Amino acid sequence: MAKNLVPSDAKLEITQIKGVIGVKQNQRETLRSLGLKRIGHTVVRSADAVTVGMLNTVPHLVNVEEAK
């Protein structure tokens, strides 16, 4: 889960772990803005302030790890 994230120069691997049925519209839009389309889909994004803010909106729907 995405907790205690702070903006940095690191790359983050973001994986959607839950579906969007029954989820608020702004959370659906946040997932689409992150580039996530389905459960199990993974994207790599930089850990800038915008991305960290989006991840703080949907921490229960995504799994975040530092990219290798």
Curated annotation (Swiss-Prot):
Record SUPFAM superfamilies: Ribosomal protein L30p/L7e
Pfam families the record matches: Ribosomal_L30
Any one GO MF annotation of this record: structural constituent of ribosome
A Gene Ontology BP annotation from the UniProt entry: translation
Top-level taxon of origin: Bacteria
Any single GO CC term annotated in Swiss-Prot or TrEMBL for this entry: cytosolic large ribosomal subunit
Keyword line: Ribonucleoprotein, Ribosomal protein
InterPro entries the record matches: Ribo_uL30_ferredoxin-like_sf, Ribosomal_uL30_bac-type, Ribosomal_uL30_CS, Ribosomal_uL30_ferredoxin-like
Subunit comment: Part of the 50S ribosomal subunit.
Family: Belongs to the universal ribosomal protein uL30 family.
HAMAP family in the cross-refs: Ribosomal_uL30_B
Protein name: Large ribosomal subunit protein uL30
Species this protein is from: Pseudarthrobacter chlorophenolicus (strain ATCC 700700 / DSM 12829 / CIP 107037 / JCM 12360 / KCTC 9906 / NCIMB 13794 / A6)
